[in-house]
Amino acid sequence: MNLKLHNRDEVFLVKLDSALYFKAEDHYTCVYYGRDTKQLLPFGLAHIEDALELCDADYMRFGRSHIINLQKVVHVSATKEMVTLLTSDNTFLPIHIARTAIREIMAHLKDERPCEEGNIAGGGNF
């Protein structure tokens, strides 16, 4: 699925299936596809958030500076204030997130259905 954004002179297509997260950069937004792959968009994060809501994509805004692809989250650490995402080349990308946003992410993920095929809720003994 593509997110189509446009201004007067340009059209931008964001590949939502492979995007990991969006990060606010002043009045712009960077979309990250991997460790060294990013695209600068001339739109604020609020504009991106509104556009994503229309797409019904599995993205959620956390804090003032991040919108994260929830399908790519593999680990959240409140202690380290880190979210680890799985890239399309099956490598892990840790990103630093503000403590309040980490709590939002953890609360959201805990509220989701506890078990999906192959997952065990609650951890512990296997």
Where do the PLM segments sit?
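Basic, polyanion-interacting recognition surfaces, primarily
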Residues: 1-126
